[in-house]
Amino acid sequence: MIIPAIDLIDGQVVRLFQGDYAKKTEFSLDPKNQLLSYQQDGAALLHLVDLTGAKDPDKRQTKLIEEIAASLSTPLQVGGGIRSAADVDALLNAGVARVVIGSLAVKSPEVVLRLFDKYGGDAICLALDVNIDADGNKMVAVHGWQQGGGKSLESLVDTFMPAGLKHALVTDISRDGTMTGANTALYCELAERFNEVQWQASGGVATLDDVKAVKTSGASGIIIGKALLTGVFSAKEAIACWPNV
């Protein structure tokens, strides 16, 4: 499945390079219209990251997100600085289909376990942003990749599997925004080890061949942001390579 994505800062569509706010590219696009165009191209799931909220939780773009979700018939998953159960409640009440939770799952797993119990596995997607060292250890980063979380990807998955984990978005930080190709070996490994989880791949997609490679890796879907925004290929072309299941 192709999952078109946009990142928002103060209502503006942007892309960051490897999570760095100082390395920002702005796009003169209306976020609602952009997601509607992806919907019209056939996307079955859309992804939005609230980078303003990620940086300052008091400035979350919840009202804009609610307006965007209301304009779409396609499910919208939203992440970016989810720091509490109240943040999750607010987004789901705003019409978001699924909330993407990263740092909170690392730092306060008991809070997220209660959210799984309250909302079920389809309403929550874990965001596991990993730095992979020379020995292949996959350590999860937190707070917009500014800090190490001190936990491995595998240990976090093991924590949440009994609670009903169904969806996980994994980004190889070294590939994000680089358009150097996705880390297909990572997704092959995860899909084989944790085949109950629907893995969403993210980071590095530059060509339709990259899309095809991830399709065969065992991942259930791929998040594509920059390649669509810069016109390398269209959402329609990507979906033709990897039709919705």
UniProtKB/Swiss-Prot annotation:
Main location: cytoplasm
Enzyme nomenclature, EC number: 5.3.1.16
GO MF term (any one): 1-(5-phosphoribosyl)-5-[(5-phosphoribosylamino)methylideneamino]imidazole-4-carboxamide isomerase activity
Pfam family, one: His_biosynth
Cellular localisation: Cytoplasm
UniProt key word Cytoplasm: yes
InterPro entries: Aldolase_TIM (IPR013785), His_biosynth (IPR006062), HisA_bact_arch (IPR006063), Isoase_HisA-like (IPR044524), Isoase_HisA-like_bact (IPR023016), RibuloseP-bd_barrel (IPR011060)
Keywords, sorted A to Z: Amino-acid biosynthesis, Cytoplasm, Histidine biosynthesis, Isomerase
Superkingdom classification of source: Bacteria
Catalytic activity: 1-(5-phospho-beta-D-ribosyl)-5-[(5-phospho-beta-D-ribosylamino)methylideneamino]imidazole-4-carboxamide = 5-[(5-phospho-1-deoxy-D-ribulos-1-ylimino)methylamino]-1-(5-phospho-beta-D-ribosyl)imidazole-4-carboxamide
Gene3D superfamilies attached to this UniProt entry: Aldolase class I (3.20.20.70)
Residues annotated as the enzyme's active site: 7 (proton acceptor), 129 (proton donor)
Pathway: Amino-acid biosynthesis; L-histidine biosynthesis; L-histidine from 5-phospho-alpha-D-ribose 1-diphosphate: step 4/9
One biological process term in Gene Ontology: L-tryptophan biosynthetic process
Record's GO cellular component terms: cytoplasm
Similarity comment text for this entry: Belongs to the HisA/HisF family.
Name the record gives this protein: 1-(5-phosphoribosyl)-5-[(5-phosphoribosylamino)methylideneamino] imidazole-4-carboxamide isomerase
UniProt organism field: Shewanella amazonensis (strain ATCC BAA-1098 / SB2B)
This protein's encoding gene: hisA
